[in-house]
Regions:
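Non-transmembrane, aqueous-exposed alpha-helical and coiled segments at domain scale
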Residues: 1-191
């Protein structure tokens, strides 16, 4: 994106004082994507065959150029850092339906550098050298694109969302289950 995507810049673009923000909802895809060059630990977690399957399922190609986006499993380490930088209160998790065809779903829960676990995301460290620590979760292997209530989701999909909540220490309040505006699950009370 050519504009600043931090939550602190939203009021500036909207023409309202930033002190008027009551909530910040961090928006995260159910898997990781990256546009452009630079370190991206998630890209190397599962290999190019897995990445290509995910890229096709999620339609992860540049809107203007058609170039394939870099993809990988959900990265809890990078996401925790992003949520902290945003000052997010809650999370909207998008594209959960894209993972529906997977028997197992990898999640990056940590990094190792030279065999030693890295305690936190450091944007100035050797991110191009870190190795992702991957936890495999069961997939649900069924179409969830019609789900609009939490109780309609398969147990494995709910477990995936709850696993991410625990890893991120944030509530996931919204879960999108399709590209259409009405295809989302409100989990819990509205903000």
């Amino acid at each position: 994106s050519s504009s600043n995507t931090l939550a602190a810049y939203a009021p500036l673009g909207a023409g309202i004082p930033n002190c008027k923000l009551d909530h910040v909802v961090g928006v995260l895809k159910a898997y990781s994507t990256c546009v452009g060059a630079g370190p991206f630990a998630a890209e190397n977690a599962m290999g190019e065959v897995w990445n290509e399957q995910l890229r096709k399922a999620g339609g992860e190609y540049g809107a203007a150029t058609g170039r394939p986006r870099r993809v990988g499993p959900f990265d809890c380490v990078a996401s925790r850092y992003g949520l902290a930088m945003q000052g997010a209160d809650k999370i909207a998790l998008t594209k959960l339906d894209v993972l529906s065809s997977l028997k197992e779903i990898p999640v990056i829960t940590g990094y190792k550098l030279d065999g030693v676990e890295v305690p936190a995301f450091d944007p100035l460290s050797d991110l191009d050298r870190v190795e992702p620590v991957v936890t495999m979760l069961p997939g649900w292997e069924q179409d969830i694109s019609g789900c609009t209530r939490w109780d309609e989701l398969p147990e494995a999909a709910k477990n995936y969302v709850q696993f991410l909540e625990k890893q991120l220490d944030h509530e996931i309040q919204f879960v999108s289950t399709g590209a259409e505006r009405e295809k989302f699950v409100l989990k819990g009370a509205w903000l």
